[in-house]
């Protein structure tokens, strides 16, 4: 499938969000949050959080929430450009905070590394919920919880990168794990998004593809191949939410700050998957 390169010259783009006609994302290792105009290719710096930044989401009042990975916190970007604390998770977690999802009622769901993936064996950890100023941990046992997307009003799906699986979680009423869908070995699922037909589009970080997964049956197909690239996130965008934007970079993170190989690609699904659109709920 042919792709258009819409943005280039970043280090490690992730946390893609389509918001108010622009594509927002985090350049994780550069500690920068960008807003991108997909028409002109212009990137605008909206926030800088050293050394690492991850998940993005908006409150109903319009303020942007950002994950400060190393401080293990969610911070809020004010209209004056200043950052303030929204939720501090440092006393709860020993390792970096990761991606998150913000619901329409301002509830935040956020994961943590849970261990050092460069030196340690995988260790399960909790998924945090932040609601009305309160922090709790209703789900445990997730291995490197990463991308989070809402399926519907009752459920979210979470990528567990180093367990090679995605987990469907009930969020209404009693929060509980509903199912785990195991992906092929070494899939390393990272960011994900859900379409209007009940499928998750999952970025496979080190497997060079986007996997489309039926969340009811577990059936899956490699929908998009991106040879030679790390594939770190995807989201729907465009006026009709029928374009898939994909964050890619080099898989060797040791030189991405020097070489800036990060690119965001756009795939027109109207040509290959007619009728498939995003839900606008990432």
Model-derived features with residue positions:
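A short loop-to-beta-strand structural motif that recurs across blades of beta-propeller domains
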Residues: 32-34, 73-75, 125-128, 165-167, ...
């Amino acid at each position: 499938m042919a792709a258009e390169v819409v943005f280039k010259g970043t280090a490690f783009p992730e946390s893609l969000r389509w918001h108010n006609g622009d594509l927002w994302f985090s350049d994780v290792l550069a500690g920068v949050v960008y807003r991108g105009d997909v028409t002109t290719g212009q990137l605008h710096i909206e926030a800088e959080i050293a050394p690492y930044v991850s998940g993005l989401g908006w409150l109903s009042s319009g303020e942007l929430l950002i994950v400060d990975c190393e401080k293990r916190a969610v911070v809020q970007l004010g209209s004056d450009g200043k950052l303030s604390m929204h939720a501090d998770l440092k006393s709860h977690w020993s390792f970096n905070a990761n991606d998150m999802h913000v619901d329409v009622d301002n509830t935040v769901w956020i994961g943590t590394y849970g261990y050092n993936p460069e030196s340690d064996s995988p260790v399960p950890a909790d998924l945090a919920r932040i609601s009305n100023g309160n922090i709790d941990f209703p789900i445990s046992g997730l291995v490197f919880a990463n991308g989070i997307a809402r399926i519907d009003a009752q459920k979210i799906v979470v990528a567990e990168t180093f367990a090679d699986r995605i987990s469907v979680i009930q969020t209404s009423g009693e929060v509980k794990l509903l199912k785990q869908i195991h992906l092929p070995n070494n899939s390393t699922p990272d960011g994900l998004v859900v379409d209007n037909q009940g499928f998750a589009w999952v970025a496979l970080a080190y497997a060079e593809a986007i996997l489309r997964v039926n969340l009811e049956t577990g059936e899956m197909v490699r929908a998009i191949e991106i040879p030679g690239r790390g594939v770190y996130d995807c989201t729907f965008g465009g006026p009709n939410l029928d374009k898939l934007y994909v964050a890619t970079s080099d898989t060797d993170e040791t030189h991405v700050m020097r070489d800036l190989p990060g690119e965001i690609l756009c795939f027109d699904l109207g040509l290959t998957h007619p009728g498939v659109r995003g839900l606008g709920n990432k």
